[in-house]
């Protein structure tokens, strides 16, 4: 495939070639979710006649703009017309390459597949793989669950968008040189949490063969929590539950403002995501971790892990230390009352404890639970990313720090952590990319350089990603045993 014009099911697309990589940006995978389609499940895109110019990214989905400067040098356009995929392919004439589909993070209300950090060029070139990045609806546009009030509306729209993008990949990626039967989904934070849900979702069944979950596992609201969140949102807008059609005429700005107001008002539970997937009989019938424990993702190999110091991204040295009541409520919300009482002594009231609580309970414990559940049905590999810069205040392996290494976009490391790009950094990036790519190709991340043993509940082998690669069995064993008491305790 030496030419950049490719024929998809919906029409022709024209991309560019740069540094040995073909790139197609801003290809629609669904109808724009605007007007009557706002808050509705995604529909396939319309067919187009001319060649579509796919040389620039599509708009990002609506989100608060105050944080965008952290990710972009130039602020991108925002629009509800945002359901686009981007495809990166090596410019060698090849067919049936493994496909890696990236699902970005951002707490379900921020982010885009077009962030510079997620440019798939280096990964595609290094690994002879096709990399696909995508946008999905965020915040109230993607995770305002309205089906309790009116059956015409679907819940979990952001997840349905991701499934629609995966369906587009299944139906079109062979035209770009990819193998539709060898698709790996990979994602971080809310992207990892999304994959936890996709593995349990009827709409995503059969659309991918392997999964990589970085710093994010199962995370859902109950149907009741979702309904009360939506009711509170409607109240801020002054719309009653019988007038949902009014939601179609509210401006995107006003929807974002209402979301912001609610997020500020609901701050009392410090560990609750305001927008997140919800349990719902049609789209997500069972809590993902429970579904996985019952074999919902049988036969899908899983690579999963966290960073050692996840929580340090979310607090600064002068962050508030929350009251004991707030911390107790958060523990109870995350663990249920009986277990919360048993582990309270792990987290005495201090800023450091708050940070550890976040690391352990939002990221590490769910990852261990998910890995354990899936290990009965498919091979699982577990990692912990320990590398960190030497200079304070960045001298921790904080949340998202592995991303520049995964994509090989190491300039992102300078931006995120003021870290120098040393030979050691380049080597670690190469090691991580090789493992991820090998997993996408074969379903096993072991390479010639690194023999990575699979994860078993008895031994809990964990690859430690640092300047030196090591293997630890059951890291932080004592804490893990407290957080997972055996049945009789």
Swiss-Prot record:
Annotated effect of mutating residue 59 to P: In strain: NRRL B8079
Outcome after substituting residue 390 to E: In strain: NRRL B8079
Phenotypic consequence of residue 246 to R: In strain: NRRL B8079
Complex formation: Monomer.
GO MF terms held by the record: cholinesterase activity
Documented effect of changing residue 463 to V: In strain: NRRL B8079
Pfam families named in the record: COesterase (PF00135)
Entry EC no(s): 3.1.1.-
Gene name per UniProt: pnbA
Effect caused by changing residue 150 to D: In strain: NRRL B8079
Keyword Phosphoprotein: yes
Entry function: Catalyzes hydrolysis of several beta-lactam antibiotic PNB esters to the corresponding free acid and PNB alcohol.
PROSITE patterns with a match to the protein in the record: CARBOXYLESTERASE_B_1, CARBOXYLESTERASE_B_2
Residues at the active site: 189, 310, 399
Enzyme class of the recorded protein, top EC level: hydrolase
Assigned keywords, A-Z: Hydrolase, Phosphoprotein, Serine esterase
Family to which this protein belongs: Belongs to the type-B carboxylesterase/lipase family.
Protein name: Para-nitrobenzyl esterase
PANTHER family associated with the record: CARBOXYLESTERASE (PTHR11559)
Entry annotated with the keyword Hydrolase: yes
Phenotype for residue 343 to A: In strain: NRRL B8079
CDD domains given in the database record: Esterase_lipase
